[in-house]
């Protein structure tokens, strides 16, 4: 089971309202950003989201990062660059890189990430 907290908000940045996703980011103490690599960076909707968080002075949060790529993963590096500009952001040590598709091994990695995040509570 991947969801281990009763208070979780999930946003699909390609479909959901960006303002609501930003609001949810401020509502919770831990943010998990999951995005695909795109053109040696991060997928455009996530880039827009991170720019908005940066503009709104997002701070004092714990952030975990997950990327998906079929080759040349770059999303985590791009997301880290955004969060490094923000004040008092604690990046979770464990990151997850999913190559191509979700497998049982990646599910195990995501569960380990969830365990690490839950230790913060």
Name each model feature, range by range.
Residues 3-14, 21-121:
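FMN-binding flavodoxin-like domain, especially the glycine-rich phosphate-binding loop
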